[in-house]
């Protein structure tokens, strides 16, 4: 079942929202290992390159990045035009710290399937480009990573929802203390508050401060502003977004660092 509500932005305008469209769900090692074993059973009976790709994707989730990279570098040789393989190889390279190669294959994935992930891969590209810029802390603080300010007002909600999707995908892989992701989340909070939802903006400011505690004071000021605006517009939102997003889980978050005796399959 879906629950739909209205929310208010910094100008007092109301917007329609599905409250569960952004949430944080860390990977569960037991579930992933069970899935890996299921895939192994299937691959042992009959090879399927799509299952092989799924095998690599689950290794990535488990934190077995070198093993996953081996899977995707082998697959891309025979299946260079498969979107999932190119995109997963890009992610494997990024998690390996090879951002040049990551950007190459994420862009290749977009060429193969421009509408993938609800047309949100532009966010992934922006983040990789920012990584390659190698900002100093001062430069990062003044950078505009997502360039959301240039988005026409009629399209900003759509763009924000694409950002929410990418954050949902990225956060389970990303440890707390990642300053770049914190900056992206902070920008998301600013534009969400301004153009979509004061309540959800508060949530994103809190998340940004968890990822980078140096943002805590600025985030607190922004949260206070949002709450003042809620009072001005006589908004009595129910903190629905905060209920679906468990801050306590995020505060304990650590990406998985798996140790799995994976099997090598010949690409067929």
Predicted regions and their residues:
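N-terminal leader/linker segments that initiate helical-solenoid repeat arrays
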Residues: 1-52, 265-268
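Alpha-helical linker/edge segments of TPR/alpha-solenoid repeat scaffolds
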Residues: 27, 127-144, 225-258
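Start-of-helix register in tetratricopeptide repeats
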Residues: 50, 67, 84, 120, ...
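Residue at a conserved register position within TPR or TPR-like alpha-solenoid repeats
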Residues: 59, 93, 129, 185, ...
């Amino acid at each position: 079942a879906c629950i739909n509500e209205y929310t208010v932005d910094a100008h007092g305008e109301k917007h329609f929202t599905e409250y569960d469209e952004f949430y944080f769900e860390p990977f569960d090692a037991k579930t992933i290992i069970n899935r890996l074993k299921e895939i192994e059973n299937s691959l042992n009976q009959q090879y399927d390159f799509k299952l092989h790709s799924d095998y690599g994707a689950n290794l990535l989730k488990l934190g077995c990045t070198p093993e996953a990279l081996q899977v995707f570098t082998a697959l891309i040789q025979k299946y260079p035009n498969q979107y999932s393989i190119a995109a997963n190889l890009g992610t494997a390279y990024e998690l390996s710290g090879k951002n040049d190669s990551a950007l190459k294959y994420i862009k290749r994935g977009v060429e193969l399937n421009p509408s993938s992930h609800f047309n949100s891969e532009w966010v992934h590209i922006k983040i990789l480009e920012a990584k390659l810029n190698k900002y100093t802390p001062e430069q990062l603080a003044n950078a505009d990573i997502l360039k959301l300010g240039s988005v026409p007002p009629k399209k900003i909600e759509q763009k924000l929802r694409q950002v929410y999707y990418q954050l949902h995908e990225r956060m389970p892989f990303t440890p707390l203390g990642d300053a770049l992701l914190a900056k992206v989340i902070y920008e998301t909070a600013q534009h969400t508050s301004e153009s979509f939802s004061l309540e959800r903006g508060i949530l994103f400011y809190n998340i940004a401060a968890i990822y980078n505690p140096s943002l805590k004071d600025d985030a607190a000021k922004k949260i206070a502003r949002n709450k003042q605006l809620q009072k001005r517009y006589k908004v009595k939102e129910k903190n629905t977004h905060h209920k679906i997003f468990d801050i306590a889980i995020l505060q304990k978050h650590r990406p998985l660092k798996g140790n799995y005796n994976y099997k090598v399959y010949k690409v067929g």
